[in-house]
């Protein structure tokens, strides 16, 4: 069958598999033996979609999801998608300042949260942000600072003052007639925005990247085709769902191929290895640090990983020797994807049948139905083969734009429709690309984009700081670490710990400078 772009919404994809392969396993949490078939999962999504309708969520409503890869993360995503709402995925490392910025900037109507991560309680941060919440009846939140925010939903069984929990939302949904749900589904178009992810992008403070059903479903479809995915595959996903790596490259790959997603809630190399062994996973995705942790785990030799055949290593610089070790010891042909959140995210991808040296040393070739050009940043002309320039993309995968920010959108998408990445690259005579650097000064730490200016402006508020510059420091583990170069006012002394303590709990931990120079 000829490969072509599909016009299905996420809900239509889900219902397709629920109808054609109802009893096939779709979602598995091996460490707790939790399993959903396509039919079971689709039914739960419909119930959740009714629950969302019951609390005022409708076409175009923005629903925040702030959680690790818990079992209902995908339920909330697809429930929102089915009724035309927009899932705004929130970085699990966010702290108070970042949360408040996102809730306001994204016009969040309903926030869905879990307890939090080890160094931050989402519950506490919500109550700090919304002092009215503890005195509010569920569904009647009236926040002075965030008037658009109407509901907070706890993803789980526990009850918190002013918040719905999952069972309550499902129960409320029972009051919604099937006809109302079906009517909501019919309003959804594949070119509607379904997901917003906040990224520093190529410049500035975090912006909401608007991605459509068409953007992300087709990126997942083509990524899977490059690795010859079929319904028989089982993909182990240990990357966070709030990133494009998890929610698109992994989840949309599974959605468009009808295979099985073996999920890991929070990265733990032992859980990953055990899941592959027990479920006979055929594919594994991860950033380089994850593969290093798996290979170096003392119990690594105890697991049978021979079922693996392929996967993706991406998110930051992928060392050639690490890719060789993964192929040799984990029995999988590693591919790499290059792109941005703004390109849904894949712009280039190596294919499973590409020669090993091409898979190790390049980021592959461009996606079908797109144009990737290496453009001279000075002249705007396309660079010849072998000449470095800016990586630019035009095609189905380009974002719809930055939310409520047409000026920033116009800065990255030119009049010809090419999205400018800010990254430098080179194309060879066989059509393979190599990334050679960045025009801007973005730091990529273990797959996380860190924008120096954001940290610099925060550190300027630290008493005693006269000037500060933030830059990347090379790291074997994370590719890059954050380094802060600080000039103090005359007579002021300061230690590294003072700077780090000033940052803790206020900015995400991956943004806190590891190296500080006075």
Task: Go through each PLM region and give its residues.
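Conserved AMP-binding/adenylate-forming core of the ANL superfamily
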Residues: 26-70, 74-78, 95-100, 165-174, ...
